């Protein structure tokens, strides 16, 4: 099973990716992990990427696609792989198609923006232990206070509503078009096109996992 998981920040992709990878015995591949591994291993592409990153630049799609092609030939990808956060843009998707990277399926986890804002902006964290709460879905016994230590909880900057809105805007402008790209490609009936499936990402984790696995069956 070779698949891409798409969905807005906070849609629950990370949680579902873990279940899917366990179920199919495939690795979860993120560009960040790939870059770090290639730099550490000192591969030609890794050294090229390091040069760009050290100068504060963005690693080009050519380098990323090269890393992807190297990564998916490794033994742990024999049964497939799950791309996490890649491709992010239409040019990356085009480059992947041109490079002949084969995909079986694109799965979109669809969650309305309002639900994502509620989900993310309600998170509260106890910094020292990493314990997380949610003001609505998993509240502490006493509002704003850690159950175990009685110490105050914080809202991370990443979870503040303004930040969440900004991340959603970036998603809508850059990554959301990929959903249409893969849906349109699948609709052409091209044999090389991955299937496109969309599931609702609201409800309990178990309900969403059941939907995800049914979509992949």
Swiss-Prot record:
GO BP: any one term: AMP salvage
Chain sites annotated for binding ATP: 10-15, 123, 132-133, 203
Key words, A-Z: ATP-binding, Cytoplasm, Kinase, Nucleotide biosynthesis, Nucleotide-binding, Transferase
Predominant location category: cytoplasm
Catalytic class of the enzyme: transferase
Record GO terms (molecular function): adenylate kinase activity; ATP binding
InterPro entries referenced in this protein's UniProt entry, alphabetically: Adenyl_kin_sub (IPR006259), Adenylat/UMP-CMP_kin (IPR000850), Adenylat_kinase_CS (IPR033690), Adenylate_kinase_lid-dom (IPR007862), P-loop_NTPase (IPR027417)
Region (LID) location: 122-159
Pathway the protein takes part in: Purine metabolism; AMP biosynthesis via salvage pathway; AMP from ADP: step 1/1
GO CC annotations on file: cytoplasm
Top-rank taxon: Bacteria
Location in or out of the cell: Cytoplasm
Binding site for AMP: 31, 36, 57-59, 85-88, 92, 156, 167
E.C. numbers: 2.7.4.3
Region NMP, residue ranges: 30-59
Catalytic activity: AMP + ATP = 2 ADP
Subunit structure and binding partners: Monomer.
Function per UniProt: Catalyzes the reversible transfer of the terminal phosphate group between ATP and AMP. Plays an important role in cellular energy homeostasis and in adenine nucleotide metabolism.
Recorded domain comment: Consists of three domains, a large central CORE domain and two small peripheral domains, NMPbind and LID, which undergo movements during catalysis. The LID domain closes over the site of phosphoryl transfer upon ATP binding. Assembling and dissambling the active center during each catalytic cycle provides an effective means to prevent ATP hydrolysis.
The family this protein is said to belong to: Belongs to the adenylate kinase family.
Protein's name according to its UniProt entry: Adenylate kinase
Gene: adk
């Amino acid at each position: 099973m070779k698949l891409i998981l798409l969905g807005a920040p906070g849609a629950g992709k990370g949680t579902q990716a873990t279940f899917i990878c366990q179920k199919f015995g495939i690795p979860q591949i993120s560009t960040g992990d790939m870059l770090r591994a290639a730099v550490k291993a000192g591969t030609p592409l890794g050294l090229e990427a390091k040069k760009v990153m050290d100068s504060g630049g963005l690693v080009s799609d050519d380098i990323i696609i090269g890393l992807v092609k190297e990564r998916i030939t490794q033994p742990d990808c024999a049964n497939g792989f799950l791309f996490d956060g890649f491709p992010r843009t239409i040019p990356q998707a085009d480059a992947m198609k041109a490079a002949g990277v084969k995909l079986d399926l694109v799965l979109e986890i669809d969650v309305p923006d309002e639900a994502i804002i509620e989900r993310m902006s309600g998170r509260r964290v106890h910094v020292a232990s990493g314990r997380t709460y949610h003001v609505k879905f998993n509240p502490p016994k006493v509002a704003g206070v850690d159950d175990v230590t009685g110490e105050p909880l914080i809202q991370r900057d990443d979870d503040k509503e303004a930040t969440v809105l900004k991340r959603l805007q970036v998603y809508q402008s850059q990554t959301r078009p990929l959903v249409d790209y893969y849906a349109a490609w699948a609709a052409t009936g091209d044999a090389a096109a991955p299937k496109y499936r969309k599931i609702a990402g609201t409800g309990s984790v178990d309900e969403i996992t059941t939907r995800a696995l049914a979509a992949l069956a």
